From Swiss-Prot:
[4Fe-4S] cluster binds at residues 42-43, 107, 137. Keywords: 4Fe-4S, Cell inner membrane, Cell membrane, Iron, Iron-sulfur, Membrane, Metal-binding, NAD, Quinone, Translocase, Transport, Ubiquinone. The lineage of its organism: Bacteria, Pseudomonadati, Myxococcota, Myxococcia, Myxococcales. This is NADH-quinone oxidoreductase subunit B 1. Binds 1 [4Fe-4S] cluster. GO terms for molecular function: 4 iron, 4 sulfur cluster binding; iron ion binding; NADH dehydrogenase (ubiquinone) activity; NADH:ubiquinone reductase (non-electrogenic) activity; quinone binding. Its cofactor is [4Fe-4S] cluster. Belongs to the complex I 20 kDa subunit family. GO terms for biological process: aerobic respiration; electron transport coupled proton transport. One of its GO terms (cellular component) is respiratory chain complex I. It comes from Anaeromyxobacter sp. (strain Fw109-5).
Length: 172
């Protein structure tokens, strides 16, 4: 993207290449992602493996945070009930912009095995916008790492100055 300005006095034209600035800022953003864990069921066990030395997500710049006010994205893993949906929405609202969500596992994506239960939300995307879906029951840490890479690609491709758009949802 190029912006053009013209000096009224001399008539000189100055070109600014803002795409290079976008690339630089997005490179910094994509390689320093801090995440908030919202593990609800079986997928919470795989989240422990995701943060362990074998998966080594810190090489991608992903660091767990205890507070939503410090997190760039949230990983929702497991069966989301209507009662917990209020808490998930509250945590999402407390995160600073730009914020992203990874839905991990069949239960988070669509309700999974428990989708016919009266208290089960039929997917996290009914409550908060989801950017990346990671399928599986439960998904392996490698699948979640692939989801993290997809999130980095999403961040790399969007202009940094835009406001948050509704999530499109990409499958990992």
């Amino acid at each position: 993207m190029t912006a053009r300005t013209m000096d009224a006095g001399t008539g000189d034209v100055t070109l600014f290449h803002t795409s290079q600035l976008d690339k630089l800022i997005n490179m910094a953003r994509e390689n320093s992602l801090w995440y908030l864990l919202f593990g609800l069921a079986c997928c919470g066990i795989e989240l422990m493996q995701f943060g362990g030395p074998r998966a080594d997500v810190m090489r991608f710049g992903a660091i767990p945070r205890a507070s939503p006010r410090q997190a760039d994205f949230m990983i929702v893993a497991g069966t989301l009930t209507y009662k917990m949906a209020e808490r998930a929405k509250l945590l999402y609202d407390q995160m600073p912009e730009p914020k992203y969500v990874i839905s991990m596992g069949s239960c988070s994506n669509c309700g999974g095995l428990f989708q016919l239960g009266y208290s089960v939300c039929k997917g996290v995307d009914k409550v908060i916008p989801v950017d990346v879906y990671v399928p599986g029951c439960p998904p392996r840490p490698e699948a979640l790492t692939e989801g993290l890479i997809r999130l980095q690609e999403l961040i790399r491709s969007e202009p940094w100055a835009t406001k948050r758009r509704p999530a499109k949802g990409s499958a990992a």
